[in-house]
């Protein structure tokens, strides 16, 4: 989760810099980030807690 947050912030920062130098392409890039934010950070658009979801999907200690 933290890695995804880091990637999203990194891309967002790059998009803001791009927006400063090229407003038209920068706006479309920011719109793309807004549309795909739920992939990188599921808690943004979901009603359940991502941490709860992650805790349910932890590998068990039992051998297969």
From Swiss-Prot:
Expression triggers: Induced by ornithine, repressed by putrescine. Part of the speFL-speF-potE operon.
Keyword check for Transcription regulation: yes
Motif extent (Ornithine recognition loop): 32-38
HAMAP family: Leader_SpeFL
Keywords: Leader peptide, RNA-binding, rRNA-binding, Transcription, Transcription regulation, Translation regulation
One GO BP: transcriptional attenuation by ribosome
Residues that hold L-ornithine according to the record: 35
Record-given protein name: Leader peptide SpeFL
Keyword rRNA-binding recorded: yes
InterPro entries (UniProt xref): SpeFL
Subunit annotation: Binds ornithine in stalled 70S ribosomes, blocking the upper two-thirds of the exit tunnel. Contacts 23S rRNA and ribosomal proteins L4 and L22.
Protein family: Belongs to the speF operon leader peptide family.
GO molecular function: rRNA binding
Recorded coiled-coil stretches: none
Known role: A small protein (arrest peptide) encoded upstream of inducible ornithine carboxylase gene (speF) that controls expression of downstream genes (usually speF and potE) by transcriptional and translational attenuation.
């Amino acid at each position: 989760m933290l890695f995804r947050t880091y990637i999203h912030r990194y891309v967002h920062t790059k998009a803001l810099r791009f927006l400063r130098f090229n407003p038209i392409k920068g706006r479309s890039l920011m719109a793309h980030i807004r549309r795909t934010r739920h992939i990188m950070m599921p808690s943004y658009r979901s009603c359940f807690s991502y941490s709860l979801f992650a805790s349910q999907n932890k590998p068990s200690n039992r051998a297969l």
